[in-house]
């Protein structure tokens, strides 16, 4: 069903609002996926706090114009599904990567984190990015470990001096 001009403007505004909040964007061709598979993909994306939309390419081109994802517009061709991640930049890539393992019909065309376009070959690297919580826990471990080593060293010196005194 064709959209009238007001509906198209509303879709562009809606997608523009999503893009304004997004930290990363993934575009993938979904040709060959069944409705059930698309529903499953949307469900997994929702669980990962990823916004997934199927929108006409021309409308998405208008929505990305003037944004950090503007360079991706040249890769928009064919039936595409778009995913947008908020704070967790790797979530959209992670959802599409995991889903495409079981469903080869989903083919990632391009992705972007901030400015610049990456091709599908870099999907695995982006999907491997740690989540915010994982990165924070690794940072805290790195900060805590030297202090713990010093404390263990001081305890060892104390025990050694006590043993010598006894």
Curated annotation (Swiss-Prot):
Q: Which function does this protein serve?
A: Forms part of the ribosomal stalk, playing a central role in the interaction of the ribosome with GTP-bound translation factors.
HAMAP family reported for this sequence: Ribosomal_uL10 (MF_00362)
Q: Which GO terms describe its molecular function?
A: large ribosomal subunit rRNA binding; structural constituent of ribosome
Q: What protein family is recorded? A: Belongs to the universal ribosomal protein uL10 family.
Q: Name one GO biological process term.
A: translation
Pfam families named in the record: Ribosomal_L10 (PF00466)
A cellular-component GO term for this protein: large ribosomal subunit
- Keywords in alphabetical order: Ribonucleoprotein, Ribosomal protein, RNA-binding, rRNA-binding
Q: Which domain of life is it from?
A: Bacteria
What is the protein's given name? Large ribosomal subunit protein uL10
Q: How does it assemble?
A: Part of the ribosomal stalk of the 50S ribosomal subunit. The N-terminus interacts with L11 and the large rRNA to form the base of the stalk. The C-terminus forms an elongated spine to which L12 dimers bind in a sequential fashion forming a multimeric L10(L12)X complex.
Task: From the UniProt record, report the name of the gene that encodes this protein.
Answer: rplJ
- In its keyword annotation, does this UniProt entry include RNA-binding? yes
Q: Which SUPFAM superfamilies match?
A: Ribosomal protein L10-like
